[in-house]
Amino acid sequence: MAPPEKCGVHEKLMIYYCTIENCFSCPYKNTECKLNKNIAKNITTWGQLCEKFYVWDYSTNFWYSTTPFPNFDVILTNTRWFYDNGVRGIFNNAITHTSGEFGELRAYLLTRIYQDPLMTEQEYYAHMDKFLQSYYGSGWTYVRQYIDLMEELSSEKHWTCNAPPSGIFNFDTVAANADKINALWDSAEAAADSASILANVQRSRLAATYIVQSAIYDDVMKNGSQAEKEAYYEKNQELYNEYLKFDVAWNERDEEIEFSRAQPPCNW
């Protein structure tokens, strides 16, 4: 919501600015992004008008909660920008169920950032690496490489927190990197130090399998042999079974999966 132009704000009034319509791929302050063209002026002006200025931000996809949500490269930039423009606090609307992506990592990083919004980028990524090492064990570097790769693959598009997978990623680009994505997670699983670490790796891998299976669907159905199609269907079945095994919420609306092994996961 744009701030008023001809009146002030009462000192007892609290303003919560919602970012739901903005781009989660670009920094909010990037006015060249078509989804963020108004937020810079709005945040700056509200910060000048209102003492009790807060932000309602987002860090998950409520419609497609198991698709990758690659916003790690803008979290710190956005939080520091809010702080510099008079925001007094942030309510982060995130995943509330068992995460099939990186919900735990985001919770940790957001806690650190909100305690110290002026931390350096080097400190931020040191916190990330510390968590990854603790949560994913010896194979954490493969998970970090995957995170960096998905940030890169999602940079082609501008997307909101309710965007479909095809609105976040170019499926052709993801398909071209499918082998690399799978190899990184295979390596992370192989390096798991314990059963609990392996479970963490496998649960977080669900989002990777989800986007790969969604991205390669058209090519497999159009050009694949019958054996390749059967292998695709079997992988979908395995993915569905893993969702049930780890009790991962399909989306934040508590809707059940409309599973079909013959359809890409983004259509379930």
Protein language model annotation of sequence segments:
Residues 16-19, 25, 59, 75, ...:
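Catalytic cores of glycan-processing enzymes that make or break glycosidic bonds
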Residues 34-141, 145:
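Structured mid-domain segments that build the active-site/substrate or prosthetic-cofactor binding neighborhood
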Residues 1-47, 57-58:
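Gly/Pro-rich turn-and-neighbor structural signature
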Residues 7-8, 28-31, 68-70, 105, ...:
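Surface-exposed beta-strand edges and their flanking turn/coil or helix-capping segments
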